[in-house]
Amino acid sequence: MPNHQASEQMLGYLYQVRYALALLLENDNSDCQISIEKFDDVAFSKDHIPIQLIQLKHHIQHQGNLADASTDMWRTIKVWLDAISETPDILDGTNFLIITTATAPIDSAAFLLKKDSNRNPDTAYEKLKTVCFSSVNQAHQRYYDAFREAGEDTVKQLIRQIYIIDCASNIIDVEKDILKHIRYSCIPKHQKMIYERLEGWWFKKAIDALCCDMPVFVNQNQVRSFIVSVSQEYVDDNLPIDILDIDDLQEDNFSANEKIFHEQLKLICLGNHRMQLALRDYYRAFRQRASWVRNDLL
C-alpha cells in the first residue's frame, strides 16, 4: 500500500526547492539573495541578514487548511516565535510569509493577513488569541504555550509583519511560472530543454547548500547568467553540449558497437587509463548525438 503521507512530504521538499527558484526569478531586486533551509524554508537576505522569511505549504492528497485553529498556521507561528526568541533583532525589518496552495477562509486570521484591502493584523491577532486561550487541542498546546510566553507586544509585532499568500501554484504549475521567465531568452521549441538544464543546475545548487554548515546564498544575477549562457547554446548554428559526464563504464554493460570499439582499442595496445578515456569519449559522443536527435536539433 502506498504511503501517501510520505509522498506528500517528499513533494513538499521538492516544491520548496522549485518554488524558491520561481521566487528568485520574480523578485524585483536583481541583487537579492536567497537561501534554502537556513533561516527558514526559504529566505531572502541582504548582506547575509534575512529580510524575508518564507514558509511554504504544499498540499495534494489532502486539502490544506488555513482556518484559525489550523496546524499549518500555528506550527508556522511557533517556528517564527522560536526564531525571535533566539534572535530578537529578527523582528526589525523582516517580513514573514506563508505561501500555500490552500485557500484562506473568508474572515479568518489568515484572510486578514493577506496583502490586500481586507488586511487587518489587529483583528487577526484577536482571532488567534481567542483560539490560543480557548482551544482544547492537546496536539497544539506547545504552539499555544509559545504564543502566550512570547508576550502580547512581541506576538502583535510579529503578526503585523506576517503576510499570507494563498492559492499559490502547486508543484506542477510553478514549472509554468518559471518557463515564463525563460521564454524570452530562446525560441519556443527550446524552452523545455533550457528549463530542464536550469532546474538540474538549480537542484544541484540546493543540494550543495543543504550539505553545507554555513548559509549558502544564490542571487538572481547568477540564475539569469546561467539562463543566458545556456540559451546561447540553442541557436541555429550551434549544437549544445549537455552530456558532460557519465558513470564508470563496465564492460559487461557494453552494447555490441561498444564491444567492437573496445576490441579495436585493444588491438592498438592502449593502456587501461587511455582506453577508459577513449571509451568514455565514445560513449559521451554517442549519447550526445542521441540527445540531439531526440530533441530535433539535427
In which residue ranges do the predicted regions lie?
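Acidic metal-coordinating catalytic centers involved in nucleic-acid phosphodiester chemistry
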Residues: M1-Q9, H58-L298
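Catalytic centers of nucleases
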Residues: Q5, Q9-M10, L14-K78, D82
